[in-house]
A protein has these predicted regions:
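Active-site loop/helix belt of alpha/beta enzymes
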Residues: 1-112
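Charged (often Lys/Glu-rich) extended helix/loop segments that serve as interaction or gating elements
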Residues: 73, 83-85, 89-240
Length: 240
């Protein structure tokens, strides 16, 4: 027998999260209840936003809900439904799957500035990183960042610059509206890139990068080594 129902709208905004919950209630009432009066779990899936920084919030056209707001709108609707309808023998557990919501702040991404060029009145910053290291989506937002200058003397004052990756893909852009003082050799730390980053990096141009843990703001500890040539080709049977 079926004891669990799952949906995954990945709604994000609070009004869409409410719609997702109402759709689940409609399914339970009009479809599922015809086949069973037992249900142990209801999962509304994921798609919730993280407790993101103001830099990210300002790039979105709606208010970012808190975790409490997500919980209130879904749990109240589900609870009211079960109290009113009394279709099932026992009230099931309500589950959510906060993947991105928890993982996004787990990682930052550090790149080095290789060159800065000016083309048609716009500065183009080339780096040792790629958007494929953090999120290959064409709809990705500009990440919050911090610049570490090796020297203040040779910095250029960049406004609305493009920060680009090392691949030959025209859309490999890490930041589309970069404003900071910068020079070659500086470091840029892109923050809040833990969601869909490592797992979506293809072995294209360069393999994946190492991961370090910064302990007590003073010590680096390697927790995953960078990929090598051998990692990329070890699965192939070489005919030579």
């Amino acid at each position: 027998s079926i004891i669990s129902i799952h949906c995954h709208y990945a709604p994000g905004s609070i009004d869409k999260w409410e719609f997702c919950t109402k759709q689940m209630i409609s399914f339970l009432k009009n479809k599922f209840s015809k086949y069973s009066d037992k249900l142990s779990y209801i999962s509304l899936g994921g798609g919730m936003f993280s407790d993101m920084s103001q830099e990210l919030k300002s790039q979105l056209p709606f208010i970012i809900p808190t975790f409490d707001e997500y919980a209130n709108v879904s749990s109240k609707l589900i609870n009211d439904f079960f109290i009113k309808e009394k279709i099932f023998k026992e009230q099931p557990e309500l589950l959510i799957e906060p993947g991105t919501a928890l993982a996004s702040k787990a990682l930052d991404f550090l790149v080095k500035v290789v060159s800065i060029k000016k083309i048609k009145n716009q500065y183009i910053v080339n780096t040792t990183g790629s958007k494929y290291n953090v999120n290959p989506s064409v709809n990705r937002l500009n990440s919050p960042f911090e610049v570490f200058n090796k020297s203040k003397e040779s910095n250029l004052k960049l406004k609305n610059a493009l920060v680009c990756g090392y691949t030959c893909i025209e859309t490999d852009i890490l930041d589309k509206d970069f404003n900071a003082d910068l020079s070659e050799g500086d470091l840029i730390l892109f923050k809040e890139v833990g969601s869909y980053s490592l797992v979506m990096k293809p072995q294209f141009i360069l393999p994946n990068v190492p991961i370090f843990e910064f302990i007590n703001n003073e010590k680096l500890s390697l927790i995953k080594r960078g990929e090598t040539f051998e990692d990329v080709f070890s699965g192939y049977q070489m005919l030579c």
